[in-house]
Regions:
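Peripheral, non-AAA+ core regions of ATP-driven protein-machinery
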Residues: 1-130
């Protein structure tokens, strides 16, 4: 049986670490999220970050990756157009990230009106023009 966690794509070291933290956090908290605690013991998770040859780096996708893993383990889709960002620690603390302005603009361009941002980035968001 092939199981574990595999990352592919042009990911920088910080993003790889962020993905590994998200995976470790979710495995440690499966019960808290109402998931089968053996789910990842029986599964191979392959996370591929596309976008051509453009390298990706930074901690901003930690919360998003953890959310995707919980969604997978619960066998429940995230039902609405949604954008999110935030760093994540092994204890589940959500960390602020940079580039809030650019991320909000990208979400709006994609017609995504619901965003989840770290609380610590609230001021960055409030300072944006409408």
């Amino acid at each position: 049986l092939n199981r574990g966690f595999k990352l592919t794509g042009r990911l920088g070291e910080v993003m790889k670490e962020s993905a590994e933290i998200a995976y470790s956090y979710v495995i440690a908290h499966l019960k808290d999220y109402g998931c089968d605690q053996d789910f990842f013991d029986m599964s191979m998770v392959h996370l591929h970050v596309p976008e051509g040859a453009t390298p990706k780096d930074g901690p901003s996708a930690g919360v998003t990756m953890a959310t995707a893993l919980v969604s997978l383990a619960r066998k429940e889709r995230i039902k609405r157009p949604l954008a999110m960002t935030g760093g994540l620690t092994l204890t589940g603390q959500v960390l602020p990230v940079g580039g809030i302005r650019e991320k909000v603009i990208a979400a709006r361009r994609s017609k995504i009106m619901e965003l989840i941002l770290p609380h610590a980035n609230q001021r960055d968001f409030e300072e944006l023009p409408d």
